[in-house]
Amino acid sequence: MQENAAVLFNRVRLFSTVSVSLAILTSLIFSDLLGSSSMSWQVIIAVIALALGIPHGALDHLVTLPKSEPKKMALFIIVYVAVAIVAVIGILKFNTVGFIVVLFMSAIHFGIGDAAFINELDKRSEGTKKLNRWFYIPAAGFTPVFIPLVNSASIEALASVNPALINWHQGFDSQILFTVSIFTLLAIGVMVFDKRYREALDLIVLLLLAHLAPPLIAFAVYFGCWHAMRHTARLTLSLPRCVENITQGMLRKAFSNAVIPGLPALIGTFVVAGLLALSGRDFTDEFFWMALVVVWALTVPHMAVTAKLDRAALT
């Protein structure tokens, strides 16, 4: 079981690294051919990447209340959805403030989630020096979230999503870019010093994604192909059917069994986003903005629910 789980985790890790690397390469090619100001190809790639990531948060009830009574499960889902709805209203009503709050929540959640993924892998490996979380967590979380939103390409991206967010940083864009970049470079140095070369590679790839890919692609690809994939791998250790699959060596089936139950959430997210966007002038831009709002809103209850899972993985 432990050896098979390690194989699954390493495959997912390779997938996330390759996906982000391809996103960087694709961004460079398309930016050169179509221009960095062309948004159509960016929105298409971003929507696909977001679609890959949305199902991972739809299994929170199965992990939190694995054997609960139907009434308790229904109550949990109602409260979960209610919190998300309140978050949607908050983000739409207070665009900038809500955006900043979600950014910090996402950065913290992403960093802790990545460290938890690595710790689960470390538990199944021998002779590995303990990960320096004080450097890895902030670097892994803040790099893919903040850098894409303060670099030179962020203005056009934010304008296409919601013009009200363009100046969210209140003029401190250069300081944020410098601080996060320097800290991540320092964290990479710490990883190399500790001989955590794979973690150093992870941070290098994330730093390149944040600096070289358009903001929409940087966030969406990270969310869907990195964070969501690694979170789903961790879910396979908590879902009985997945554990059974892993024990039997059926790793693909184990992973798919952690994804399929979340597909209705994917459909629901795009249906809700589409309905909210119907009143907009530009369907593509309005739809994408509403899809992001729904995803960000779901982060609020999702982060609260997965805190227990993260805490267990980090101990």
Feature locations, PLM:
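Hydrophobic, membrane-inserted alpha-helices
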Residues: 23-27, 79-88, 182-187, 200-209
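C-terminal ends of transmembrane helices
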Residues: 3, 55-66, 110-122, 185-195, ...
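Membrane-interface helix-loop-helix junctions at boundaries between adjacent transmembrane segments
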Residues: 66-74, 78, 85-147, 160-163
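Predominantly late transmembrane helices and immediately cytosolic-facing juxtamembrane segments
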Residues: 113-118, 213, 222-254, 259
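Alpha-helical transmembrane segments of multi-pass integral membrane proteins
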Residues: 104-108, 113-116, 132-155, 173-189, ...
